[in-house]
Structure formats: structure tokens, C-alpha cells
């Protein structure tokens, strides 16, 4: 009997560590998905560097309490799977949101970003954001635009002076 309790405590510690170390977590209800659809979802999440596991709600509830995350209890009903990302804050939300658009059976329940519980709508909003690399490239193009425009202006002035000299 105590071996089972120890195993459960170890599982709670493991889940708490995953929740603490992840930059984003998405909680979903996977009822109604076929095995093939779940396999497809898992492979998409794996490609994005996201871990996807099914846990008992009681274990997640205790782990969230241990990790200092409050407000998850109301979302931990029915079959629950958790997708966590420890590197890219939008990866889990992006893959889950995209998959949920194509598969109505996948229901986004909630999420956790940087220790704060977010709603399903907020998860979908985060999922529509560009990735970190996309945001960096947008920032770089915005920073390069004034320099590029200045270079074009200098080039145009130079060409205009050449035409006037002739």
C-alpha cells in the first residue's frame, strides 16, 4: 500500500516540476478524438518541442498546488491532457489551437503562462501569435527599414546629381 502512495507522491512531484519548468501549458479535453487523431496531435506537438501527457485530475490538482499555481481546479474535470513547452511560450498554444480548428472534438479548457492561469480564449489568442523567431524577424525588418530607406534616398540623390551633371 505504501509503495502505491510513494509512486503517487513521486508522480505529483514530477508533474509539479513539469508545471514549474514550463513557460506555457495548455490543458485540453481529448474526448471524441480517434487514436489516429491523438497520434497525429502527439507527433505535431513533438515536432514543436512540446510534451503531451494524460494525467489524473487529482494528481494535476495536487501538483499545481505544490507548484504554486492557483485557479486550475475548475478546469480539471473529465478527461484531461496537458501539453507543456519549456522553451517556446507559444508552441503548445499554436499547435493545440490549430489542431482544435480542424478537430472540433478537441476542447481547450485552459492554460498556464508564466505561472498564471489563462482562459481558453487567451490560449487561442496566444496560439495566433507568431513564434519567437517570427517576432525577432519582424523586429529586425522594422529596425532595418529606416536605414534601407535612407540608403535608397542617398542613392537617388546621387543618381539625380549625375543626371544634372551630364
Swiss-Prot record:
Function: Forms part of the ribosomal stalk, playing a central role in the interaction of the ribosome with GTP-bound translation factors.
GO BP, one annotated term: translation
Keyword annotations from UniProtKB, A to Z: Ribonucleoprotein, Ribosomal protein, RNA-binding, rRNA-binding
Pfam families tied to this protein: Ribosomal_L10 (PF00466)
Lineage, highest ranks first: Bacteria, Bacillati, Bacillota, Bacilli, Bacillales
Protein name per Swiss-Prot or TrEMBL: Large ribosomal subunit protein uL10
NCBIfam families according to UniProt: PRK00099.1-1 (NF000955)
SUPFAM superfamilies: Ribosomal protein L10-like
Subunit structure as annotated in this protein's UniProt entry: Part of the ribosomal stalk of the 50S ribosomal subunit. The N-terminus interacts with L11 and the large rRNA to form the base of the stalk. The C-terminus forms an elongated spine to which L12 dimers bind in a sequential fashion forming a multimeric L10(L12)X complex.
GO molecular function: large ribosomal subunit rRNA binding; structural constituent of ribosome
Domain of life: Bacteria
Organism, scientific name: Staphylococcus aureus (strain NCTC 8325 / PS 47)
